[in-house]
UniProtKB/Swiss-Prot annotation:
Subcellular localization, as worded in the UniProt entry: Cytoplasm
Protein name in the entry: Prefoldin subunit alpha
Assembly and oligomerization: Heterohexamer of two alpha and four beta subunits.
InterPro entries referenced in this protein's UniProt entry, alphabetically: PFD_alpha_archaea, Prefoldin, Prefoldin_subunit_alpha
Family: Belongs to the prefoldin subunit alpha family.
Function of the molecule: Molecular chaperone capable of stabilizing a range of proteins. Seems to fulfill an ATP-independent, HSP70-like function in archaeal de novo protein folding.
């Protein structure tokens, strides 16, 4: 029979592994979201650099609805600053602001990837520990079965 303490430790390891795996998944989702934001910023920077005064563009209204609008001044760009604040900037300054956001996103993504690597290492170590514990429990169980078999003296 397996030791209750070992079985409990194995259960605890399993729960820790599950929690780590869930955290890794959450961090990966966050990385994906940040990468999507980076793509959006790249597209905005490209658009700013190719905008021309007098050009007609489609402006999203939400819910997949758009309106056509004419660019009056391609050098006046409104850039979100965060927390629902925005500022009007020249095209060059807007690209610079967006580039700064890109750098911050790069740093955050790198930090998240480091966290993921650490958690994956921890997960691997816990998996090895759980496997060793299972092997040990199986060996003990086999030994107990052998000890319980009657010996033939004939």
């Amino acid at each position: 029979m397996m030791g209750g303490g070992q079985q409990q430790q194995l259960q605890q390891l399993s729960e820790e592994l599950q929690a780590i795996d869930e955290e890794i998944d959450e961090l990966r989702e966050e990385v994906d979201d940040l990468q999507s934001e980076q793509t959006s910023i790249d597209e905005a920077m490209d658009a700013i650099q190719t905008l021309e005064s007098g050009a007609t563009v489609q402006v999203p209204l939400g819910g997949d609805a758009y309106v056509r609008a004419e660019i009056q001044d391609a050098d006046e760009i409104i850039v979100g600053l965060g927390a629902d604040f925005a500022a009007e900037q020249s095209a060059d300054n807007a690209v610079e602001s967006l580039s700064t956001k890109q750098d911050a996103l790069d740093n955050r993504i790198e930090s998240l990837r480091d966290d993921i690597d650490e958690l994956e290492t921890e997960s691997s170590q816990l998996e090895q520990q759980a496997q060793q514990m299972q092997q040990q429990m199986q060996q003990q169980q086999m030994q107990q079965m052998q000890d319980q078999q009657p010996e033939d003296n004939e």
